[in-house]
Amino acid sequence: MSRVCQVTGKRPVTGNNRSHARNATKRRFLPNLQTHRFWVESEKRFVKLRLSAKGMRIIDKKGIDTVLADMRARGENV
């Protein structure tokens, strides 16, 4: 499974580690992904999503039904 948030689309980005001497070595910044089950009352079932902490906050704000409708409009299979 890829390291991509299903709600926000956040994915790993690359950058540099910087030592005290300012030497640069490549590294990846990974999103804070969590797997979470949400109860969808309209469908009477649980939906399991892999999402970032920001994605959870979006669901808290908009509601799971609205977020799922947006995801389905993008063509995501949930």
UniProtKB/Swiss-Prot annotation:
PANTHER family listed in its UniProt record: 39S RIBOSOMAL PROTEIN L28, MITOCHONDRIAL (PTHR13528), LARGE RIBOSOMAL SUBUNIT PROTEIN BL28M (PTHR13528:SF2)
Residues covered by region (Disordered): 1-20
Cellular component, GO annotation: cytosolic large ribosomal subunit
Family recorded in the similarity comment: Belongs to the bacterial ribosomal protein bL28 family.
Gene Ontology biological process: translation
Keywords, alphabetical: Ribonucleoprotein, Ribosomal protein
Name of the protein: Large ribosomal subunit protein bL28
Protein's UniProt keywords contain Phosphoprotein: no
Pfam families named in the record: Ribosomal_L28 (PF00830)
Originating organism: Vibrio campbellii (strain ATCC BAA-1116)
NCBIfam families hit by this protein: L28 (TIGR00009)
A Gene Ontology molecular function term of the record: structural constituent of ribosome
Keyword Transmembrane helix: no
Top-level taxon of the source organism: Bacteria
